[in-house]
Amino acid sequence: AQSFKAKGFTLALVGGPVRDALLGRLGNDLDFTTNALPQESKKILNEWAENVWDTGIAFGTVAGKRGDTTVEVTTFRTEHYDANSRKPTVEYGKDINGDLSRRDFTVNAMALELTTDKPEFIDPFNGLQDLAEKTLRTPGLPNDSFNDDPLRMMRAARFASQLDFEIEPAVLNSIKELAHRISIISAERVRDEFTKILMSSNPRKGITLLVDTGLADLVLPEIPKLRLEVDEHHHHKDVYEHSITVLEQAIEHEDRLGGPNLVI
């Protein structure tokens, strides 16, 4: 932060790392936002990091690694989306509030300004209150957010699973309404989010959300179809419920005895 400040730039910790720090679970992957242009951020990172890469520079992002710590520094930006793609047209923004407004959920739209005399907590969308209430809500209108980037609907189910949060009713209704938009997302991106749901502490919650919102009908139709399958031994209400229970038992077994993170 001091290197950015010395060159007249601002730097703020932002997004997931702020959320996780408030939850007492800050990791080694840190995201920052700045008013410095990517080329300037790269120069500063080159002075600090052991390795620097700029594969995301077209979107304003430069990354670096030092020891076990990985950082991504992204220039303030605004985004405009084509209706048939989740890849945005990026324009550099003027302030951090505009940058935070593009985030997926309010709990990910908080920042900690590090180049002021004292660290300043920035929370224009009441993310701290939503964090305390364990609620997923969008900074703006949910329809706008999910139309812009339909993958955020999968992320809602993932965060609900990982953090044991509830999705605000208006957000949940928007997901049901716009579930069909998930079709523009690549299979690889969908797979990654679904894997994170499976690896979460409460996969039942995320999978149930995918089924109840209609997302599963489009990305993994085999799952909701299990509800139509009858357990021939009548030990369970349906094959879906049985499958979820087996998954939970497998996770409990792995947590108790240790084992691979994921085998499919």
Regions from the language model: what does each represent?
Residues 1-264:
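Catalytic cores of the polymerase beta-like nucleotidyltransferase superfamily
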